[in-house]
Amino acid sequence: MDQPEDTDALVRFENITYSYPYSDSRVLSDVNLKLEKGEFVLLAGPSGCGKSTLVRCFNRLVPEISGGKLSGRVIIRGKDLREEKVHKLALEVGMVFQNPETQLFSLKVEDDLAFGPENLGLPGKEILSRVEKSLKAIKLEKLKDHFIFTLSGGEKQRTAIGGNLAMEPEILVLDEPTSDLDPSGTREVLDLLRRLNAEKRITLILIEHKLDEVFELADRMLVMDEGKVILDGKPFDILCREEGKLKKLGIHPPQIIEISRLLGFNCRTSSPPYENILKRLAELLMPSTRELQPESRKEAKPKIPPALCPEESLSHVRIEKLSCRREDGSETLKNVNLDIKYGEFLALLGHNGAGKTTLAGHLMRFHKPSSGRILLNGKNISKYSTAQLSQQIGYLFQNPDSQIFMNSVFEEVRFGLKNLKIPEEEMKKRVNSALEMMELSVYRNRHPQALSRGQRQRLAVASILALEPDLLVLDEPTTGQDRGHIHKFLDKIRELNRLGKTVILISHDMELVAEYAERVIVMKQGEVLLDGPAAEVFLSPEELDAAGLIPPLPARLALDLRKQGFDVPGMLTVSELKSFLRAHNVEIRD
């Protein structure tokens, strides 16, 4: 996509082409781009399309750190970055990664913010001034003396952003900064980015797959595929005009745009406010479904049953009075009781630090409970060896790099089978099947670190599936993946579930949970707050709010329509809303 040279542009990419040292294929191919000061740019595209590689060219992490072959020029404020040192570029470009833990170095918040300015050798007064301004910008003044390990995920990410702000860069690049955060933490970070762009005119480049939360913040959207920028324009314009092309790339429009178009709104320049969508729905449904007066529904509230445990159904996992304490005496789990049946597909929800991962980790004996027990197939898990547990339970960690260590994709998937002494022919069959299921067959000979994070996530899952466990525990398995791959992946997991596999999904993505999980468990501060069918749990706004969660848009609309007196079911997805409207002869636009 050629653009005329603009000497006034803040950033120019000129014919950027790049290949990693361990691959002959181009990750970036003849990219031409210019950015103006104060722009808020949303960078989208399928996993592995080159987004992360592109933004690492801003501060020469590519190729100085990654190696490989880079041709073309990146120019910032007229300076050719080939002539600049990486450490000096920190003054021009701030970089925030997916996992804040990778760039937090100090014990306390204010110390971490001071780290960069101290390394510049600035006077003490200047360092203090920058730290104070950064604390104010990220709204963590009251936590400046707190230890970083005590912060929530959102607070840690804001601290990472604050550390960059203390360097006073003109450009801030963020590579999926909300991917590991709960909805509350995501709101914190996105609100901060909005303020930084509006008040300080910092140029923002944001890589993000979760378009629902970010598309209205950006004033420009770039879409990449196969190392090239293929779309460049206003977010609303691209999302509305290029829906077919985007869906082929695995990029799905935000729910508010989908629903607005269904109801006949023009979304070319903006989406209508939630209140207008609700009003239009009420007008369309008035003739057929308004069977109750608002007052009669005013106090209606879905009841959330305790853990589902029909006695005639054998438990796959039974958790009894499970508690866990840290060394400092604080409780991470408090008297948890759950009964999980064979073949269930359930989701564990809750804010960062609610105890979801800790609870799931107890299944693999990663933690030692202070009291209580867990039965797997009716047998106490303390009686299983680690090898036996690994054959019974497939566990996917939040960070795929925690369980990837071989030199090729094929060898990675083969590793567990080899340790189990599976016959060679059977081993090859399982490896090939798992790679095909995760759409990684073409990468079988590639080094895992040459894959994108989303692809590495799928590789970790393939390694698990090859072992053929009966229980799958997936801790944020969709991190770093585009919507298309997410749906393909979870469709495969649902197929396995229908074949009898039990699935426990830990996620912060309410839309995906609403679409795939049959049962939802919400945790807060180490306790089970809600447990029941997904439709009922998502119609409990007060409890969800207390847990820092936001129900999907269709569920919120259903709840508010009920409050107005409409007899509507609990709708969780856009397709369920479509079906409901069609059933009541409401004319909609597909």
Curated annotation (Swiss-Prot):
Keywords, ordered alphabetically: ATP-binding, Cell membrane, Membrane, Nucleotide-binding, Repeat, Translocase, Transport
One Gene Ontology term, aspect cellular component: ATP-binding cassette (ABC) transporter complex
UniProt-annotated binding residues for ATP 1: 45-52
Superkingdom of source: Archaea
GO molecular function, a single term: ATP hydrolysis activity
Residues where ATP 2 binds: 350-357
Domain ABC transporter: from-to ranges: 11-251, 317-550
InterPro entries: AAA+_ATPase, ABC_transporter-like_ATP-bd, ABC_transpr_CbiO/EcfA_su, ECF_ABC_transporter_ATP-bd, P-loop_NTPase
Record membrane topology: Peripheral membrane protein
Entry EC no(s): 7.-.-.-
CDD domains from the UniProt entry: ABC_cobalt_CbiO_domain1
Keyword check for Hydrolase: no
Family annotation (PROSITE patterns): ABC_TRANSPORTER_2
Translocase recorded as keyword: yes
Cellular compartments annotated: Cell membrane
Protein task: Probably part of an ABC transporter complex. Responsible for energy coupling to the transport system.
Family: Belongs to the ABC transporter superfamily.
Name listed for the protein in its UniProt record: Putative ABC transporter ATP-binding protein MM_3016
Species in which this protein is naturally found: Methanosarcina mazei (strain ATCC BAA-159 / DSM 3647 / Goe1 / Go1 / JCM 11833 / OCM 88) (Methanosarcina frisia)
Taxon lineage: Archaea, Methanobacteriati, Methanobacteriota, Stenosarchaea group, Methanomicrobia
